[in-house]
């Protein structure tokens, strides 16, 4: 880790990503936080850390990340705040009360938190998403990030024909952000398939969520 910290600092790479969608859920994560804090003190790296925490233990999230302070942007993926949508996606969120407690505790310490939504999920409407955003704003979360649904293999959004037909998904291809280059005089582009409409959210409504 010392080697990485030195190389990153010398290359002017200021940030680090934690490749763990449930950080702070197991004891070793607290040790990882202490290690990152020691690297920051010794090498001034990383200056910022992006990671995704688990949802089921607010105390663990707060305590395991406390050492990282303002350097750690805590992402809590809720995807949707609508119960019927969560049922369609076979997902359960942290309780609203616990989410509010986490947001308020982190805000008191001046620590940033990001709530992540995905659009358009099955059963989500423009009205239900706006209601969910208002609910999140009421918790005092620092920022809300709405991600466009990516149609990935290994998920029903790409591989389940019946699921796609049931929810009448419409998709388009787009350039992946920053994933393009010119190699040996040839332009190289990376594209991805994303959802832009369902039977419950028209393309016009989808565009409205992007304003």
Residue ranges with predicted function:
Residues 202-211:
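Charge-patterned, long linear interaction tracts outside catalytic cores
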Residues 35, 132-133, 161-165:
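Short, hinge-like loop/turn segments at secondary-structure boundaries
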Residues 95-98, 125-128, 205:
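An acidic site on a long C-lobe helix of protein kinase domains
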Residues 2-114, 119-121:
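Conserved SAM/AdoMet-binding glycine-rich loop
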Residues 26-28, 84-90, 119-127, 140-203:
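Flexible glycine/acidic-rich beta-alpha junction loops that bind and position SAM and/or redox cofactors
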Residues 1-11, 153-154, 161-164:
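Short intrinsically disordered, low-complexity coil segments enriched in acidic
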Residues 61-64, 122-138:
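Catalytic cores of alpha/beta
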Residues 115-117, 136-139:
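Conserved beta-strand->loop/alpha-helix structural units within folded catalytic cores of enzymes
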């Amino acid at each position: 880790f010392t080697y990485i910290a030195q190389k990153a600092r010398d290359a002017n790479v200021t940030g680090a990503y934690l490749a763990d969608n449930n950080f702070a859920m197991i004891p070793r994560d607290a040790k990882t936080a202490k290690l990152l804090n020691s690297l920051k003190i010794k090498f001034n790296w990383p200056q910022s850390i992006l990671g995704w925490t688990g949802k089921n233990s607010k105390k663990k999230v707060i305590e395991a990340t406390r050492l990282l302070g303002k350097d750690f942007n805590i992402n809590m993926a809720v995807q949707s705040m609508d119960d019927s949508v969560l049922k369609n996606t076979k997902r359960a969120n942290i309780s609203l009360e616990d989410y509010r407690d986490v947001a308020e505790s982190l805000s008191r310490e001046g620590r940033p938190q990001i709530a992540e939504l995905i659009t358009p999920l099955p059963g989500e409407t423009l009205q239900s998403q706006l209601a969910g955003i208002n609910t999140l704003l009421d918790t005092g979360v620092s920022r809300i990030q709405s991600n466009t649904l990516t149609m990935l293999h290994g998920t029903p959004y790409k591989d389940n024909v019946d699921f796609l037909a049931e929810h009448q998904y419409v998709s388009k291809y787009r350039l992946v952000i920053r994933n393009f280059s010119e190699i040996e005089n040839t332009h190289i582009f990376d594209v991805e398939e994303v959802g832009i409409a369902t039977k419950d959210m028209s393309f016009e409504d989808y565009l409205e969520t992007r304003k």
